[in-house]
Regions:
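Phosphate- and other anionic-substrate recognition elements at nucleic-acid/protein interfaces
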Residues: 1-195
């Protein structure tokens, strides 16, 4: 089973998991406010023992300058961030540290965690011109477009926030990887973003 995760602040209730089942059926699972988001993800994986791949909207590495390799002196952005327009892992600070720690825990559980960036996939799928991240009123229209492009089957009424929609985009990035249609940005030595 593959999942997509929109990763939020630890206790904010903004973390959402999109889970792909048989026949392209998708379910959405949202972390509650004041619930530990990291534990929510780990508990979810334990409850579904067949999860093998998870795509997450969070940095999973630091700029290569911190490894003192190749004489690179960009301490703020990785190549992948510059190419995709993603935020600096350093700006995201604690979220980045939590995501890297989560990656280690998930690897121990047999789950491969891959960094994705839903905004870049929205650009690739031409969803930005359709109101992506503009106003919540665009979510139903974008859900319909995503269903057409992905063949996902899900209840649009469950997509209540942009966090839910980004979880779906993260899941579609994982699906694109399965279909060998993914795009990879950045330097593998430093960390890549896959959509």
């Amino acid at each position: 089973m593959i999942i997509g995760i929109d990763y939020g602040a630890k206790m904010a209730g903004t973390t959402v998991i999109a889970c792909l089942h048989e026949q392209n059926q998708v379910t959405l699972h949202a972390c509650a406010k004041n619930q530990d988001a990291d534990q929510f993800i780990l508990d979810f994986i334990k409850s579904y023992d067949d999860v093998w791949l998870a795509y997450i909207d969070a940095p999973l590495s630091l700029p290569i300058a911190y490894k003192r390799l190749n004489g690179n002196n960009d301490y703020f952005y990785r190549k992948a961030d510059r190419i995709t327009g993603a935020m600096s892992p350093m700006f995201l600070g604690g979220l980045t540290a939590r995501a890297i720690q989560l990656k280690e825990k998930m690897q121990k559980a047999g789950v491969k965690l891959v960094e994705t960036y839903p905004s870049k996939l929205a650009e690739v799928l031409l969803l930005k011109n359709e109101g992506y991240k503009k106003d919540k009123e665009f979510i139903p229209q974008l859900c319909s477009l995503l269903k057409e492009k992905s063949d996902f089957v899900f209840d649009e009424n469950q997509v209540k926030t942009w966090h839910h929609f980004d979880a779906l985009l993260s899941l579609y990035s994982a699906k694109r990887f399965e279909m060998q249609a993914a795009m990879v940005f950045g330097n593998p030595e430093e960390g890549t973003i896959t959509v």
